[in-house]
Amino acid sequence: MNKAIFLDRDGTINVDKNYLYKIEDWEFIDGVIEGLQILQRLGFKLIVITNQSGIARGYYTEEDAHKIFDYMIKELEKNNIKIEKVYYCPHIGDECNCRKPKLGLFYKAQKDFDIDFSKSYAIGDKVRDLAICDKENIKGFLLNEDEKIENPRIQVCKNLLESAKIIEKRNG
């Protein structure tokens, strides 16, 4: 079985600009490249799981979403970082099982990549990004120092690089 890092996108990898879909608006958060390189070097599969309700709201199309996903993947590849896959929910509301905090996309990724949750981590800037930590034996990092969280498996950090360095100390 494999170990993975489940990454949120907006506010975790890139600067959160509401309903981002234009390449010219893309901006990596400082330290993301270095953090992802550390995690990849440790043997983690890097998997993005993101809510993209802007599609259902009509702000942009699925094609627009795929263009920005492809751009992100190509930019990371320039730094020898491989994103295994981007899983996304295009819906609004609770009618589906794929919109975080629901766990459908996590379980799909687990099946697709033979992931051992007990050796994996989830990283996101919102509590809903880490709902998997409540249901499975997976550790998480909340990249929002203003949030308070009671789950002992979740640690608050300021950014992805800080969380990667903590994971490196635990797994290095």
Q: Positions of the model-derived regions?
A:
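Alpha-helix N-cap and loop-to-helix initiation/capping positions
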Residues: 23-27, 60-68, 100-101
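Short, small-residue-rich loop/turn micro-motifs
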Residues: 9-11, 90, 144
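Active-site neighborhood of HAD-like aspartate-dependent phosphohydrolases
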Residues: 1-45
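A short acidic, helix-capping loop that chelates divalent metal ions and anchors anionic groups
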Residues: 17, 22, 54-59, 92-96, ...
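Asp-based, Mg2+/Mn2+-dependent phosphohydrolase catalytic module
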Residues: 67-84, 93-122, 126-172
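Substrate-recognition element of Asp-dependent hydrolases with the DxDx(T/V) motif
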Residues: 32, 36-72, 82, 87-94
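Active-site flanking residues adjacent to catalytic metal/cofactor-binding acidic residues
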Residues: 7-9, 50, 124-125
